[in-house]
UniProtKB/Swiss-Prot annotation:
Protein name per Swiss-Prot or TrEMBL: Leucine-rich repeat and WD repeat-containing protein 1
Organism in which the protein naturally occurs: Xenopus laevis
UniProt entry keywords in alphabetical sequence: Centromere, Chromatin regulator, Chromosome, Cytoplasm, Cytoskeleton, DNA replication, Kinetochore, Leucine-rich repeat, Nucleus, Repeat, Telomere, WD repeat
Subunit: Component of the ORC complex.
Highest rank taxon of the organism: Eukaryota
Length: 722
């Protein structure tokens, strides 16, 4: 036993200082401390303490009021602690270690998940995915069972407006009965389930005594099953999703064998503009027995037929100097947009690496988050059966990942904090990619490893996005007309991970684009679908694990619909800032800028399911009738980009009207594009001339150095913004 004093605590703590309030770390390990040695008066002075180590002592419990509200890391391993509920006094804990406390069980782990909302690591293991599953999915299920038990057994014992005395009389019997009768999960979690059920039951009784408005929504069930495979395991058969899986272009029911070289013709829309059923085809290769792998490749480049300017020639031969480019200021953007020149044209998704492949369609691209300023700017692209990661400056394909028989439609990056074998934290960029097989593949590109797969949907995945607030929260949209929220977890040092399904959102058609609302990332998701634009409540504290849309947005263009024109197909949507959304409909000929906040404020009550979008501005775009040409935004630079069917890239610099947009001022005139980039005349290695193409998607990096456009004819075009 050691007597703790101010002097001793200052000696054991860091940084070295003269006041307890300045301590950030404190190591009291192996000091034979008992419960009575932890003086609350001393500990309450360490208001800024971030990390506390009291491991290898003889503690039977922790004091209940240490007032260490900023504590993030707590280690009390190798003690005699029997109860973890005392940890709720540390709401900001992110990491806890309590190994070798022989009285603590797996049920205590689950209790800690519920008590500590910010906990990410327990006993040196990442638990984000499992903890979120317990906090949300298990909580929902147990809440539903407790409420169902109340409804069937005890509700009739109370009058409509029961007095508190009557509620208290029934409450004691109800709590005892529900704890004894509600079962969930394996027997090893029996103690946790009883504890959790009692908490839920007490909250239910409390809500009745406070007479809130009763929620009469039906209880909806959600599937919690998800299959995970690590890279060391053979991928299971995907026969259930190979036969009849939809193609990426579900515009019209049509025989795919009669398709021309470019599968999109405006006549396809004219034939049956309201038919939204996906086309189907038999896949050439089953997912079974088709291993995925990273491969080395030298991708064919396509040369400019016209001679570039001397300035451009210098750019093509320039090498990376490692000197970071100064970010563009808003005043320089317009000037920069006048100086965008082609840099590389690559055929890196060719079948068999053939330079004659002008049929493979490219669907999505995303710039890798910058973890190191010395690293080259890299962009991930997908199309056909492969994913490429390209150095924008050199045009070199640094990594290529291929899955025979797959057709990738979407990809998205996230940055995770991984713990290495040395115990050190390091940030890694992870790429999630999905497509025809309905499987999300988790790729650590720098490690040249696809470390796992999530069997997310039985039909093809059309779109994905990560939450900007929770880096492990992944939304996947599919041709099965569902959007599912996953917690993908963080891989350990051996790349083992455990994803969890948290929420299912039902859509009325295929989701094409989707975004978490930046101003409220825990509350709403907006998606552009084949029959309109919708928003869902994604709050995980709600009862329903499966939900329909909260609201549908109407656009002025809908009033002009007729038999040969369907404007409900919203094929593009992106946030320009925290409030303004850029979106367009098929055959619209323009792009809408509309306010999320003002639109939602027009909702008079929650029973209103349709809202007129508050349009702030309209921007002229191509009169193309070709669907699924995706726009993108640069929130950092207030710019919008969109390609068209002739290979042109439309660019809108909105800095000049930024103030009006932020004030919600309506612009009555249609805004012209700031610049239109024309497709250059290209010549392949076999002297094939490419004078125009269809641009599927355009994106720029956050610092506005590179613009990347993907085409329908297997060409990745990279442009340099000077």
């Amino acid at each position: 036993m050691t007597k703790l004093t101010t002097e001793l605590l200052l000696k054991k703590g860091l940084p070295k200082c003269s006041h307890l309030k300045d301590l950030k770390k404190l190591n009291l390990s192996k000091m034979q401390l008992d419960l009575k040695d932890l003086d609350q008066k001393l500990f309450s002075q360490m208001v800024n303490l971030d990390e506390l180590d009291i491991s290898h002592n003889t503690l039977s419990d922790l004091p209940g009021n240490l007032r260490l509200h900023n504590l993030r890391i707590l280690n009390f391993a190798d003690n005699h602690v029997e109860d973890v509920t005392v940890l709720k006094q540390f709401p900001n804990l992110e990491e806890v270690i309590y190994e070798d406390n022989i009285y603590l069980t797996v049920s205590d782990n689950y209790k800690v998940f519920c008590l500590l909302p910010k906990l990410r690591r327990l006993n040196n293991k990442d638990i984000t995915s499992l903890a979120n599953h317990v906090r949300f999915v298990n909580h929902r299920e147990l809440s539903n069972r407790v409420e169902a038990y109340w409804e069937s057994k005890y509700k009739d014992k109370l009058p409509d407006k029961p007095p508190s005395q009557k509620i208290n009389a029934v409450a004691k019997d109800f709590i005892k009965a529900v704890v004894d009768n509600v079962r969930y999960g394996p027997s090893s979690l029996k103690d946790f389930v009883r504890w959790k059920v009692e908490m839920i039951a007490r909250n239910l009784i409390f809500s009745l005594s406070n007479d809130p408005k009763k929620d009469t929504d039906p209880v909806l069930q959600t599937s919690e099953d998800t299959a995970v495979e690590n890279s060391s395991k053979k991928r299971e058969s995907a026969d259930e999703c190979t036969e009849g899986s939809p193609t990426k272009r579900p515009r019209i029911q049509i025989d795919l064998q009669s398709m021309p070289l470019s599968p999109r013709k405006s006549s396809r829309l004219q034939n049956s503009p309201l038919c939204l059923t996906p086309t189907k085809r038999k896949q050439e290769t089953s997912a079974q027995g088709t291993p995925s792998k990273f491969i080395e490749t030298k991708s064919p480049k396509i040369a400019l037929k016209t001679t570039p300017s001397k300035k451009h020639t210098n750019e093509l031969s320039a090498k990376i100097t490692g000197k970071p480019k100064l970010p563009l200021t808003p005043k320089k953007i317009h000037k920069a947009l006048d100086n965008i020149e082609p840099l590389h044209f690559l055929q890196c998704h060719s079948k068999n690496n053939s330079c004659e492949d002008f049929k493979t369609q490219l669907w999505a691209c995303a710039f890798e988050p910058n973890l190191d300023s010395s690293c080259p700017k890299a962009v991930a692209t997908c199309g056909g059966d492969s994913i490429c990661i390209i150095d924008c400056e050199t045009g070199k394909v640094m990594k290529k990942y291929k899955v025979t028989g797959e057709e990738f439609f979407t990809l998205v990056w996230t940055t995770l904090t991984m713990i290495g074998k040395d115990g050190q934290k390091r940030k890694i960029n992870v790429l999630a990619a999905g497509g025809k097989y309905g499987v999300v593949r988790m790729i650590h590109a720098k490690g040249s490893l696809c470390y796992g797969e999530i069997k997310a949907h039985k039909k093809a995945i059309s779109i994905m996005c990560f939450s900007p607030k929770q880096e492990t929260f992944l939304f996947t949209g599919s041709y099965d007309k569902r959007i599912i929220l996953w917690d993908i977890g963080v891989p350990d040092c051996d790349y083992n991970f455990r994803p969890s399904q948290l929420l299912t959102l039902d859509t009325t058609s295929v989701p094409l684009r989707m975004c978490v609302v930046p101003s409220c990332p825990d509350e709403f998701l907006v998606a552009a679908c084949e029959d309109g634009c919708f928003a869902w409540d994604i709050g995980l504290d709600k009862k329903q694990g499966r939900r329909s849309h909260e609201v549908e947005f109407n656009f002025p263009l809908y009033k002009e619909e007729r038999k040969d024109k369907c404007f409900h197909i919203i094929d593009s949507l992106a946030f320009l800032n925290e409030d303004i959304i850029a979106s367009k409909s098929v055959m619209q000929g323009s792009i809408y800028l509309w306010s999320w906040e003002k639109t939602l404020k027009s909702r008079k009550n929650k029973n209103v399911k349709k809202l007129d979008a508050v349009i702030l501005s309209q921007m002229k775009w191509s009169s193309s009738e070709t669907p699924y040409l995706v726009l993108s935004t640069s929130p950092e630079r207030d710019c919008v980009f969109c390609g068209d069917e002739d290979g042109k890239i439309w660019i809108y610099d909105l800095d000049s009207c930024k103030a009006d947009l932020q004030r919600g001022k309506l612009c009555s005139t249609v805004k012209e594009p700031t610049k239109i980039l024309s497709w250059p005349l290209l010549c392949s290695q076999k002297e094939k001339t490419v004078d125009k193409t269809l641009i599927n998607v355009v994106t720029v990096d956050p610092t506005m150095e590179y613009l990347v456009a993907l085409t329908d004819i297997n060409i990745v075009s990279i442009w340099k913004i000077q």
